[in-house]
Amino acid sequence: MTKNNHQLLIALGSNIGLATSRPVDIIKDAIIELSKSGIILKSLSRFYETPAYPQGSDPNFVNSVVKAEANYSAHAILQKLDKIEEKFERQRNSRWSARTLDLDLLALEEQVLPSKEVFQYWCDLPLSEQKKKTPSELLLPHPRIQDRVFVLLPLLDVEPNWLHPILNKTAVQLYQKLPEQTKKNIQTMQ
């Protein structure tokens, strides 16, 4: 690790192309934009195709995870991710809607933001409430990592021993706890 840089994990997803770009191309271009923004890429997962949520509601997603380093605060990284999403015409029409690009800061070292209590509130929020509510502040680690096969499987490619700072489980352990049916719905892309 470069002096003063922080280890971070970013999830990438896309299920709507642009005029000249398919979702997989958007993910590849977004990775280039991450590098241009001062985020140093260390490793990239394979690309995975996953159903949209709820299944059948929208085109399938292309998902990936990058392990990176940066000498920025969590909030500065989030601003950079938002600018990259804007470059790819990201629209925030509704929660969990189709999108050209979704960049999520999954973790920044062992940081818990804004607090363990706030994280726990969002982590424990019932699905019916998750559909309606959106956090107004940055949450780290991302409160849904443990629930999402489209995050955990790519995460296994780049950092299988990543330890969740609150749940105290590795990425491998979190993946193993997922229902088998959800694991069947994800495909490695060629």
Residue ranges and their predicted role:
Residues 53-60, 75-78, 85-190:
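Flexible, gly/pro- and Lys/Arg-enriched active-site loops
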Residues 2-39, 45-49:
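N-terminal beta1-alpha1 ligand-phosphate binding loop
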Residues 29-33, 76-83:
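Long, highly charged amphipathic alpha-helices
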Residues 12-14, 66-70, 107-110:
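Short beta-strand-to-loop capping motifs
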Residues 18, 83-84:
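Short, charged, low-hydrophobicity "junction" segments
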Residues 34-38, 84-89:
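A common structural junction motif
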Residues 43-70:
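Short, charge-patterned binding micro-sites
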Residues 8, 40-43, 60-64, 99-103:
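A generic structural signal for short beta-strands and their flanking turns/coil linkers
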